[in-house]
Amino acid sequence: MAQRQPHSPNQTLISITNDTESSSSVVSNDNTNKGWSGDNSPGIEALCAIYITYAVIISVGILGNAILIKVFFKTKSMQTVPNIFITSLAFGDLLLLLTCVPVDATHYLAEGWLFGRIGCKVLSFIRLTSVGVSVFTLTILSADRYKAVVKPLERQPSNAILKTCVKAGCVWIVSMIFALPEAIFSNVYTFRDPNKNMTFESCTSYPVSKKLLQEIHSLLCFLVFYIIPLSIISVYYSLIARTLYKSTLNIPTEEQSHARKQIESRKRIARTVLVLVALFALCWLPNHLLYLYHSFTSQTYVDPSAMHFIFTIFSRVLAFSNSCVNPFALYWLSKSFQKHFKAQLFCCKAERPEPPVADTSLTTLAVMGTVPGTGSIQMSEISVTSFTGCSVKQAEDRF
């Protein structure tokens, strides 16, 4: 059985933003087109490096996000408002890692699109849904952190968790609505390059001859899934920064230790969300820029240079890496998550959570009495724990 050869850079048509499914099949009378020749050949070493990188992204991402989700559902103290959104992010990342990333890895050995017309539509829908869940969840989470910083002492309503779950569900629904046109119009198209006597099969959302559609599609994806959400997030964090600067002029006194701790906790979570946003922006920017370059340049086919191929691989790997970095960013930023992550990773029993401080109060009582046989009066102090019966939001910010 003849070994399949990877496609050359000029035989891969990158047709949709954040593309994880595009693939091509080459039919040529020229035997030199069956492999990569000359300086553009990545060689078996480069091919192995690509597959090892994909394998690391998939395995590490699945492990990290699965543990994050397990920590959320098994640890009651972690079931808070910001953690609901972060867990929703983990589900979106898992969806991408289990479907689109393995499919993308088949490009380099497969001779054509392996998953048919239905697979093209389904995978296009999943890919854009996952990207939408990531960026829209970060937007909602930034808005939530802004409210928490501006009103740090405001109590959450009793149904706050339920309302947050509904918001997270709405993010998924909106993401699916935005991804629906991708599923409807995506198809496996065959393209021909008369200069090289070869044909291309690719899962795309438009025929390659429709240059205007490609330009509109790339621009809309860049705006809807990158520029607009990140602009909104930037506004929220500008307001957060201004609020935090003003708060330094009115720091609570030592007697208000609970208020101080709550404010500091919300500041810490705001910084954590900002790190997640920055990771998303950095990981997805090269992929968006590459798609815009393909859409608005006069070239019909991908630049055949080795440098272009390297940048294409780099942009894909960086975009997929965003789906596995969030759990490890949280591990680095949150001691609480770090503790539970280690416990789940090494199959140890997590430490029992401390009892809520806000539900009890320690009261010192003075007791006066007469000592028998002496007639002298002695006063003693005892500590009594009283249950207030009110639930103050004390563990809101765990990650």
Curated annotation (Swiss-Prot):
Cytoplasmic side: 64-82, 144-163, 242-272, 334-399
Extracellular topology ranges: 1-41, 104-121, 185-220, 294-313
Disulfide bonds listed in the record: 120-203
One GO BP: regulation of blood pressure
Main location as per UniProt: membrane
Membrane-spanning residues: 42-63, 83-103, 122-143, 164-184, 221-241, 273-293, 314-333
One GO cellular component, as annotated: plasma membrane
Location(s), subcellular: Cell membrane
Membrane topology of the entry: Multi-pass membrane protein
Lipidation positions, renumbered (S-palmitoyl cysteine): 347
GO molecular function, a single term: neuropeptide receptor activity
Assembly mode: Interacts with C6orf89.
Role, per record: Role in sperm cell division, maturation, or function. This receptor mediates its action by association with G proteins that activate a phosphatidylinositol-calcium second messenger system.
Protein family per UniProt: Belongs to the G-protein coupled receptor 1 family.
Name listed for the protein in its UniProt record: Bombesin receptor subtype-3
